[in-house]
């Protein structure tokens, strides 16, 4: 078993991606001997691959934050004002919480009406229920404007 392990890393290092692609094709086509050898190669590759997948997951979670948009709005409202990372994190959590409340309320409304789909009408009603007074009016008008812009062009 030790010679097999010694043979595999040099082929991976020297060949890089080209041998890996060549090895995957025979596996798809089948071959009992190659199939037995490949799991050990897979085991050697999986930590690297799983590490890359974890990096991709981290990147996806970064995409899900609203930090960039919070910063853009801050600069529109107060161009010479900054924001700390802790304050940015709090604002991001606040937006996530509000969106979750609106989504939950919209889901309840669609269930009450026995409709399988959450439409813009349910979202609008949920916003009116979740947000207080004047804030709800502004949110509804901005949301209506955004939906109109999205559907028209």
UniProtKB/Swiss-Prot annotation:
Originating organism: Chlamydomonas reinhardtii (Chlamydomonas smithii)
Compartment annotation: Nucleus; Chromosome
Annotated SMART domains: H2B
Record protein name field: Histone H2B.1
Bias (Basic and acidic residues): 1-10, 20-54
Keywords, in A-Z order: Acetylation, Chromosome, DNA-binding, Isopeptide bond, Nucleosome core, Nucleus, Ubl conjugation
GO cellular component, one term: nucleus
Changes after translation: The N-terminus is blocked.
Disulfide bonds: none
Sites of N6-acetyllysine modification: 41-42
Gene Ontology molecular function, alphabetical: DNA binding; protein heterodimerization activity; structural constituent of chromatin
Region annotated Disordered, chain positions: 1-61
Acetylation recorded as keyword: yes
Primary location class: nucleus
Subunit comment: The nucleosome is a histone octamer containing two molecules each of H2A, H2B, H3 and H4 assembled in one H3-H4 heterotetramer and two H2A-H2B heterodimers. The octamer wraps approximately 147 bp of DNA.
Encoding gene per record: H2B
SUPFAM superfamilies with a match to the protein in the record: Histone-fold (SSF47113)
Cross-referenced CDD domains: HFD_H2B
């Amino acid at each position: 078993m030790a010679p097999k392990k010694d043979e595999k890393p040099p082929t991976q290092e020297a060949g890089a991606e080209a041998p890996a692609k060549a090895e995957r094709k025979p596996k798809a086509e089948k071959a009992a001997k190659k199939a037995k050898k490949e799991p050990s190669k897979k085991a050697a590759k999986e930590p690297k691959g799983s590490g890359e997948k974890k990096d991709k997951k981290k990147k996806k979670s970064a995409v899900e934050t609203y930090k960039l948009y919070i910063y853009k709005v801050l600069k529109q409202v107060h161009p010479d004002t900054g924001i700390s990372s802790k304050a940015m994190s709090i604002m991001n959590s606040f937006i996530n919480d509000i969106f979750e409340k609106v989504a939950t309320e919209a889901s309840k409304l669609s269930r009450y009406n026995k409709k399988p789909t959450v439409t813009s009408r349910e979202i609008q009603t949920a916003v009116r229920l979740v947000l207080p007074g004047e804030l709800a009016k502004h949110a509804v008008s901005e949301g209506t404007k955004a939906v109109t812009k999205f559907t028209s062009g």
